[in-house]
């Protein structure tokens, strides 16, 4: 998800997306630990997406 798309969302929607992405990251880490995750790059992409969402949420709240 691009930063421009995130900025068009409302603060509540961004928070919901953060929760969803955090849950997905937890599941991906669990799959990675058990050896079931084939695409490990997805874990890093999700981590960066959460960071991007949190950064833009702080910008919106100011």
UniProtKB/Swiss-Prot annotation:
Record-given protein name: Large ribosomal subunit protein uL29
GO CC field: cytosolic large ribosomal subunit
Keyword Ribosomal protein: yes
Signal sequence residues: none
Keyword annotations from UniProtKB, A to Z: Ribonucleoprotein, Ribosomal protein
Family classification: Belongs to the universal ribosomal protein uL29 family.
GO molecular function, one term: structural constituent of ribosome
Domain of life: Bacteria
Underlying gene: rpmC
Record-linked InterPro entries: Ribosomal_protein_uL29 (IPR050063), Ribosomal_uL29 (IPR001854), Ribosomal_uL29_CS (IPR018254), Ribosomal_uL29_sf (IPR036049)
Pfam families with a match to the protein in the record: Ribosomal_L29 (PF00831)
Biological-process GO terms, alphabetical: translation
